[in-house]
Amino acid sequence: MSKNLLTFEDVSVNFTQEEWQWLSDTQRDLYRKVTLENYKSLVSLGIPVYKPAVISLLEQGKDPWMVQKKGARDTCPDWQYVFKGTEFISKQDIYKESAKVLTMGRSHFSSSLDCPDLKEDHENEDWFKNRLGRQEVHSHQLFITHKEVPESEIRGCNPSCQAVHQNAILDVPQCSSTKERIDQSEPQKRSYRKKSVEMKHKKVQVEKRILKCSECEKVFNQTSSLTLHQRIHTGEKPYACVECGKAFSQSANLAQHKRIHTGEKPYECKECRKAFSQNAHLAQHQRVHTGEKPYQCKECKKAFSQIAHLTQHQRIHTGERPFECIECGKAFSNGSFLAQHQRIHTGEKPYVCHVCGKAFSHRGYLIVHQRIHTGERPYECKECRKSFSQYAHLSQHQRVHTGEKPYECKVCRKAFSQVAYLDQHQRVHTGEKPYECAECRKAFSNSSSLAQHQRSHTGEKPYICKECRKTFSQNAGLAQHQRIHTGEKPYECNICGKAFSYSGSLTLHQRIHTGERPYECKDCRKSFRQRAHLAHHEKVHTMESFLSLSSPSPSMSSQLPRTLGLIS
């Protein structure tokens, strides 16, 4: 029989009134429980099931025994039995099973043990619970009474089995005696206590058989779980994002993904009020506060708060790089690095700032960028209490206090605290300017200079002073401006102790002590401490050239030396 044609009758057992009277209260409770569970299981599997009368009786707390119809065969109604076969069985097997059932009602119960086919049944657990526990998908349904086994067919059995069948048939009239019926029930009552384990085991087998993946044999408790699992094998992804078209196999995954576009973060940390789009991310974050690191590397004993971080770390020891770019063949130790790298080829920038609309290829870049708008600086220096928006910037800053300059130029031996500064410096020697403005084709030696330059075309000024709302195109410009409000003068002259708010002002001041005049006029070889003074001086020569062409008066010529004397 097909699994789809499973019916309530296939997993049910009916009792007559007299049969029901034989059962103890415990056995009746077990019958009620199993029968109701079977019915609920069929309904939960989506199988169309009418509500049988026995279910209605059980739900109302009434006895579920069935009335024996008049005019039935002259057999003991107590032995009316529904036999459920689990396979396509032969007639001989049918008679063997029938013999087991029929013999159990006899007063000479022990004589049936001579048949080897019946010994197993008596050695097993409770016959009653076996009846309730037959819940496999059945292929035969046989209604058997004492007199339904033709004598001619019994001849196919072995002699001991034939005796059992003969005795079972001949002794049927004895069941009409109340005393004999009570005597006969004693072996059954003793046998009833044995098969609850088998019944429950068979029930689980049915559910597993119905909810098993045909590809990998994995078993599930619910059809919905099986359906979701099978999409792993089929690759089906029926849930698509209307924003970006990305598809998912589960609706829950789509719901999580949508929060990237909406910015929704419903899960908030009670410690720091930081919010997350997924509950799992919140659970991981909370380990920052608790310090819990349950995942430890067996090689170096380093511990991690997330198992994914441990997995990635272990690839340092193994050298494994399983994620390879199909475009350029570059390999990575984890999938997120590969995904980020592939955006170089695709140009994809899925992370958009909701304030200014700027897009980024990495989520981390967006988070750092958003701190420009919020002013958040979560990383603080313990030495000077200065705070930073990025941890990398804090690490770089701390070298100011330690004096560490680990990056040295091989050409001039100049050392730097940051590798980026070394890279920029080396372009002084090479003359390389790899960053070119698409608007005016002007080239720069570093990307930050290009980014700052491009704002001259766009007019963008993303850095806002919270005090006076003045805007700036560069963060450095904002930082300098804020010292007007704070009165901070961090740059102090080592010679005279005078302090300045800008490093450039200190540099100019120190030239007074050193006598340095780095800006020289090409016309008269006169030198100046500041570029602005040189530019002003050069206008004098421009004026002289103009006057010589127009024959200036002696009075105007006499004023030129006085003007030159002012700019020294």
Swiss-Prot record:
- Role summary: May be involved in transcriptional regulation.
Carries keyword Aminoacyl-tRNA synthetase?
A: no
Family membership: Belongs to the krueppel C2H2-type zinc-finger protein family.
Keyword annotations from UniProtKB, A to Z: DNA-binding, Metal-binding, Nucleus, Repeat, Transcription, Transcription regulation, Zinc, Zinc-finger
What is a GO molecular function of this protein?
DNA binding
Q: In its UniProt record, which GO terms are filed under biological process?
A: regulation of DNA-templated transcription
Just give the chief location class: nucleus
Query: For this UniProt entry, what's an example GO CC term?
Result: nucleus
Query: What start-end ranges are recorded for coiled-coil regions in this protein?
Result: none
What protein name is recorded for this chain? Zinc finger protein 583
Zinc fingers (C2H2-type), renumbered ranges: 211-233, 239-261, 267-289, 295-317, 323-345, 351-373, 379-401, 407-429, 435-457, 463-485, 491-513, 519-541
Look up and give the organism this protein is from: Mus musculus
| Domain of life the protein comes from | Eukaryota
